[in-house]
Amino acid sequence: MTDDRLTDPVAEQVLDGNALAGMLAATFGTEMTTVPGQCAHCGTVSMIGELRAYVRAPGAVLRCPTCDGIILRVVETTEATYVDARGAVHLRFVRR
């Protein structure tokens, strides 16, 4: 068995969702890494911090750790922040 990071040049660029903690907190106004969400592709429930983060594109993409489906896209421009969450059935924000 080989280590995927040695054979896949993209694998070394993958972070976990915690890498986007600051961007997501600024966008949503709350700590997001512990927010659970359900993948629309496979039904897995994961916290945002557990998702696979790809940050080298113009923006950030968060993917399901189980099926690799795209759950969330975030793009920041000088004028606005765009969030595409169509890959999530839901995100669960607990009231405090």
Regions found by a protein language model. Give the residues of each.
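Short metal-binding segments enriched for Cys and/or His
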Residues: 66-82, 93-94
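Short Cys/His-rich Zn2+-coordinating modules
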Residues: 15-29, 44-50
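Short cysteine-rich clusters marking metal-coordination/redox-active sites
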Residues: 39-42, 64-67
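Short Cys/His-rich "knuckle" micro-motifs
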Residues: 46-53, 74-77
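Short linker/helix segments within small regulatory modules
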Residues: 52-61
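Short, charged, intrinsically disordered terminal tails
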Residues: 4-9, 78, 85-96
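A charge-rich, low-complexity, intrinsically flexible signal that marks solvent-exposed coils, linkers
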Residues: 7-9, 13-15, 26-34, 38, ...
